[in-house]
């Protein structure tokens, strides 16, 4: 019998449904150049055999200097608004954004951290367990780009080496054009390669590239979750959910399904 999942929570919005592997922003600084999901992931999704991928949230940590637009970026994604009356984040805040990837429910838990030095000790406690690190800077302020090195070091100090996807994101793209934008992006791409990060330019004000960027983040995190689950999967599977009522029912092999404890027979 083919396994299936039954969504019981609110439906995912249409622009959060991902059916094909999202493309990079620039091939000069991207984590993966491929254009399709891993074949094992595609097969698992087709058979709704993705294990705990629908159960887990991927933790995304967003860091960067004060006023680079971290909160505005997150609000554009989650609320589709741009805040003209900006208030600095105090400590940390987070949003949960639901996606459907190759037919499977999946969520990002996006942590918005304060850019002020005085809140660093508070925010650092929330860096642990990140699957994705987004280091944001202002495309119009080269100093904020230089500071991303330290922000990345701070987050990596709380996580295992090689365990996180790293993104370098230039904000306020709407304020630059032509040669000025090309120059700023060239410098950022150079740094992204040093960081082993994928680079994106976005605008929270206009919404340019915001949905595409987070779709890319979600797809990479989802694929990694499924592959990790396939590697450590036990012989018997069961039904799992994502905490919001989305269920994934995993098929149990017949050799296990039909086995009875000794001494038990049919009534």
UniProtKB/Swiss-Prot annotation:
EC code(s) of this entry: 3.6.5.2
Keyword field contains Hydrolase: yes
Activity regulation details: Regulated by guanine nucleotide exchange factors (GEFs) which promote the exchange of bound GDP for free GTP. Regulated by GTPase activating proteins (GAPs) which increase the GTP hydrolysis activity. Inhibited by GDP dissociation inhibitors (GDIs).
Residues lipid-modified (S-geranylgeranyl cysteine): 266-267
InterPro entries linked to this entry: P-loop_NTPase, Rab, Small_GTP-bd, Small_GTPase
GO biological process: protein transport
GO cellular component terms attached to this protein's record: Golgi membrane
Highest taxon of the lineage: Eukaryota
Localization: Golgi apparatus membrane
Listed cofactors: Mg(2+)
GO molecular function: GTP binding; GTPase activity
Keywords: Golgi apparatus, GTP-binding, Hydrolase, Lipoprotein, Magnesium, Membrane, Metal-binding, Nucleotide-binding, Prenylation, Protein transport, Transport
Motif (Switch 2) on chain: 113-132
Protein name (Swiss-Prot/TrEMBL): Ras-related protein Rab-36
Gene from which this protein is expressed: Rab36
